[in-house]
Amino acid sequence: MSILNVEHLTHGFGDRAIFEDVSFRLLKGEHIGLVGANGEGKSTFMSIVTGKLMPDEGKVEWAKNVHAGYLDQHAVLEKGMTIGQVLKSAFDPLLKKEERMNEICDRLGTADPDEMDGLMEELGTIQDELTLHDFYAIDAKVEEVARALGLLDLALDRDVTDLSGGQRTKVLLAKLLLEKPDILLLDEPTNYLDEEHIAWLKRYLLDYENAFILISHDIPFLNSVVNIIYHMENQELNRYVGDYDHFQEVYAVKKAQLEAAYRKQQQEISELKDFVARNKARVSTRNMAMSRQKKLDKMDVIELAAEKPKPEFKFRYGRTPGKMLFETHDLVIGYDEPLSKPLNFTMERGQKIALVGTNGIGKTTLLRSLLGLIKPLSGSVEQGENLEIGYFEQEVKGENRTTCIEELWQEFPSFSQYEVRSALAKCGLTTKHIESQVRVLSGGEQAKVRLCKLVNRDTNILLLDEPTNHLDVDAKDELKKALREYRGSILLICHEPEFYQDVVNEVWDMSRWTTKIF
């Protein structure tokens, strides 16, 4: 049975086409991975099927009475609510039925016999619905999902406005899972999850009976939970049965076959054109030349899609710093309350360190404290000599209305326009991207702009806060290669062991330093 039908979808932004005559069908119980490079339109597709964005052309049709739940990259939480209130709001329809049930019970004492029958019938119907949906186990369900995603550690009575980006994503994901929609639409749900919570979500999705569409650049995660791949490329959407690895195998074969057919056809076209040119003037061969020309005119010419630029990151190494890079003296980090015990550690030249630990434990706070962007609650940070620091922030707040060209030019005013364009293109951005405002780019494209600023600056130490979030597979592989080759030191926050294990020579677990009880 088809849950969602998308027919002849066409959409673009200005003169930049995203889809061209795309069709899509979601069947009951399908577990779909929606894949493609940054900027191909995956999040735009999700916005269109959920009605947040109207397509230029085409039709989106949901089956009747289907409840879709959507977690997008930029979802927000309502101010003033606690974590517990947000999670419990997943059951609002049932809570309203309970209110109605209580109203009926209050009226039964004064109802006349005629009214009594109707009220009793309605009461029975509501009680059956509440029982069917395990209404009386709501608190247990909330606690189960909150524990699985690490939200109990934050306290359910905590205001959502106090949460980090990763914590907010967890709350929204937990609420969505508690709603148990007929279809889950998940846009990069693992970006802000820790390893243990990714493992839990993996188990949850494996057991999920309903359908889901998942956007993710986390290939091991994708491989473990999906059975259908939809690949978005060059304004097309193509379906492949199987996991991501199987898709790659089939895609590579199809691409090789198409390229071989293209070369063969181009050879034939060249020979036909040559024959026509040599023989059309002669009376004796004119008919044969005309026949060849007709064949050329009727030929369905194979076109190869233009190759997308692959990013190339190469970090510039500046002058050699002193042996000591950072040294802390009884450093206590935090905002209103301490997040750490007094810290006494030294980071030295040549170290490449992964900083790990659950969300909210203080990893970002530590980075910002080392940089002097946050004042410590007590203690001090000593920075070494000749430091040239490159810092990649996890979240950049505000809506950036500058174009990519302007963004880079502000950072490097001495660059010529050619140098600016070349630098952005080298990081995997097309001409259309380069001339667009930063705010209209996908999360991955925005990350590439920020990385572009970083690789064009001399540094001798990189502080990177979740740099792989939103990056597509090619960009992630290239970033890993660049970090392995980088001659400087690295302090890296990352939730993907398969990324950082090949980059770092040490792993620091912040759970050893935290004041939090887990």
Can you name each region flagged by the protein language model?
Residues 313-315:
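Post-kinase regulatory C-tail/linker adjacent to protein kinase catalytic domains
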